[in-house]
């Protein structure tokens, strides 16, 4: 894969993206504290929040606390980090992204919302959270959610 045109050649951008992708919390923290930019693209044009290990909510928190943009979209697929977290079934990461302002009502290049991906792949807890956060059925192809199954069921 060739580096993206106009991408950052700052080594710390590659280091931060690599640490985020591997879920290395302490390395991500150290790089951010040393001044690595949370939105700087790596040599392939991808931001750390786009390549982070989705199962590491703590990496997401660190990136977001240092100013990472939760709504950055992949230019080819239009997926955002919330699509990735929903597709992989990582509720903790999804909640962190949502609380940081990630939009749940955006479609990818195939017209799918994050809730659609969660439902397609059988991540019921994620789909339940997304439906509740969206106010029930908005954007979803499924029936209304039971009021007792809202975000209050999600651990902090």
Curated annotation (Swiss-Prot):
Changing residue 20 to P: In a lung tumor and melanoma. Changing residue 101 to W: In CMM2 and FAMMMPC; impairs the function. Changing residue 108 to Y: In a head and neck tumor. Changing residue 126 to D: In CMM2; impairs the function. The keyword Cell cycle applies. Changing residue 74 to N: In a bladder tumor. The modification Phosphoserine is found at residues 7-8, 140, 152. Changing residue 119 to Q: In a biliary tract tumor. Changing residue 88 to D: In a biliary tract tumor. One of its GO terms (biological process) is mammary gland epithelial cell proliferation. Changing residue 72 to G: In an esophagus tumor. Changing residue 80 to P: In CMM2; loss of CDK4 binding. InterPro entries: Ank_Repeat/CDKN_Inhibitor, Ankyrin_rpt-contain_sf. Belongs to the CDKN2 cyclin-dependent kinase inhibitor family. Acts as a negative regulator of the proliferation of normal cells by interacting strongly with CDK4 and CDK6. This inhibits their ability to interact with cyclins D and to phosphorylate the retinoblastoma protein. It is linked to The association between cutaneous and uveal melanomas in some families suggests that mutations in CDKN2A may account for a proportion of uveal melanomas. However, CDKN2A mutations are rarely found in uveal melanoma patients. Melanoma, cutaneous malignant 2: A malignant neoplasm of melanocytes, arising de novo or from a pre-existing benign nevus, which occurs most often in the skin but may also involve other sites. This is Cyclin-dependent kinase inhibitor 2A. It comes from Homo sapiens (Human). The lineage of its organism: Eukaryota, Metazoa, Chordata, Craniata, Vertebrata.
